[in-house]
Structure formats: C-alpha cells, structure tokens
C-alpha cells in the first residue's frame, strides 16, 4: 500500500511538467527564454526578504494587493515567502487594447479590504508606460493608508511615459513581448514557470 501511495503522489507533478513546454522545446511563436524558473524564484525570495526587513511587525498585517490577472502568480509566490503577517487581496484594472496600452485605465474589480491606517503593497506584473501603476498608487493614497509601496516583477524602461519609482523591482528587461509566469498573450502561456520572449504577432 505504501508503494502505491508514493507512486501516485510522485506521478502528479511529472504529469504537470509534461503539460508545460520545456525551455528547449518552445512553441514556434516563442523566441527564447528570457528569465528561467530558478532565476525568477531566487529573485522573488530576495524581494520577500527586503519587504520583511522594511515593514515593522508591530504595525499590523501588511496588505498585499495583487493586480489581476498578470500578477497573480507573482503575488502568490511573493506572499508565500513573506515571514511577517500579511493579508492578500486583488484588484483588476483594464488599460490594454489589442496588446497595447491605451493610457485609459479603468477599474474592473476593487479590493474588499479597508486600507485606512494600513501599510499597502501593490504587486504588479510589468511596468510599461506607467499608467496603470500610477492610477493605482494615486487611488490607494486617497484611501488614507499608512503607506503605499510597489513591487513589480518586470520593468521596461524604454516604454516609460510617466516617471515612477518602484520600491521592489524584480528585473529590468528590453522592450520585447513577454509571456509566462502570469503574463499572457490572448490568455495563453500564463502558466509557464519561466518568462519567454514572444515573436511579435503579425501586423504588430
């Protein structure tokens, strides 16, 4: 019975791995792996340690707000590594049309947590033009928190329109299309454990 239990447990992760393309067997529309799984996880661990050091435990649970959908994996991994007390919530906004940022940010789903008198950490997948992050930071500051800081997985400096300061940054990357680790193209590739450069779609 013990052998059967171990065999069943071990086979589940193997099956999941087969459903995810390996870095050396990428789909034709993915050009290369930009950031590998191990590199991403190391950086997330480092960011969590920085956050733990910056927020005093005596000031209550940290409110971690992940921006859907792209930051949901980053938010989960980051939150799991935090040692200080925290609460996780999510918010959804829309600023992209046809894969390009429009500059018109709309709130699609708000958080349920009250931010007044609390430290808030906004977790975003990518800093592109800066419109979305600027909108969120300004909106959250109007809710009278103790502080609002930002954690961003990827930064594209070449795409900046607004000058924004990121408190906790994962990686700076070139101006290329990227998918994986929560980021998608047409709802595909979100669950890749790495981040890959995508060949630009035809006409883009």
Locate the predicted segments by residue.
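PRPP-associated nucleotide enzymes
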Residues: 1-204
